[in-house]
Amino acid sequence: IVFHQVTGLLNSDDECWHQVKEWVEAARVANTLFYNRLGCMGHYYSGMLDIYSDLTQQYAHFGGHIEIIEVDELSVLRKEVTDEAIKQKVAVFKESFAVQNDCAQYELERSARTSVALDALVEKYKLGSMAYYYKGAAGSENEDTISSIILGVSLLTARGIPVAGEYEIKNAQAMKIMDSFGAGGSFTEYYAMDYTEDIVLMGHDGPGHITIAEGKTKVRPLTVYHGKVGSGLSVEMSVKNGPVTLLSVVQKIDGKLFLLVAEGESVAGPILEIGNTNSRYKFPIGARKFMNDWNANGPAHHCAVGIGHIHSKIEKLGSLLNMEVVRVC
């Protein structure tokens, strides 16, 4: 019989009740995952082998429901968006983001149309998270849709419906876990190291979690997208300075999943100002050992980053889900 025990005093025992609180939080997150509806829109990125997921194993470990969605459906919903809805969504953009002066009104309205359509898609399927990617073909209707999606999916992520790019289903699950714990959960990957500062630089194009940003998230125009057709608006942010937790859902050679965790710190410093999410991270074991130990566990190159140190909560969630939890630092 699986059981979990907290030992302490009924009264005047802060540590005891801290543990009880974490178990309750973990149970709530497990329940959220069990009833979550994950939307998967588009297709995988060619040759990105570490990203591919066994959907049956996702069901087996987390429960929930996975809805396979065509980009065409979002394109159809865009046609139904009214001018007034576009106007209202542009106002939301200007309130939620620091829209840079070189962002054309046409691009804001194009992104607003897609954002309103995304809201309708989420409502139709009652989605609690999402993964998407669509390479597209130049000149197609779907190009217009997918090249104007970033602001909309960033707003969804900010309101508790985390969206992962590059059809990263495992990371959509990790982001949902982090967000359900109230830690955020932004889509990221490591891309560079600063050996002098002992820093790992991490970030990604596409959606960012604007509620855990250091300052207001900027909106910038991009003339070229990474791995997809078209051009449009993107978001630029850094994760709040302070303690952070990284989480990856990893698939083992036998097909089963486990949770990979690292705790570190988001630190101030220069980042690439290229319309992406970019942050600088320090780890207690150092940048080199972090990279070696993290990669030794075989994760995909994406992970979810959230604010605060919550390994102990994730450990309890793993116990409730009967999943191994591996801590790197």
Go through each PLM region and give its residues.
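Cap/lid and interdomain-hinge subdomains that line or gate substrate/regulatory clefts
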Residues: I1-V90, S96-F97
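Flexible loop/turn segments at secondary-structure boundaries
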Residues: D13, Y45-M48, V76, G136-N142, ...
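C-terminal and late-domain segments of enzyme folds
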Residues: Y52, Q57-F62, L74, R78-I86, ...
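Short, solvent-exposed amphipathic alpha-helical segments in soluble enzyme
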Residues: S53-H61, I146-L151, L320-M323
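Flexible, glycine/charged-enriched surface loops at secondary-structure junctions
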Residues: I66-I69, Y132-Y133, G184-A192, R327-C329
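Long, internal scaffold/assembly segments composed of regular secondary structure
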Residues: Q88-F181
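C-terminal catalytic subdomain
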Residues: T157-E273
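Extended hydrophobic packing segments that form well-structured cores
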Residues: K228-C329
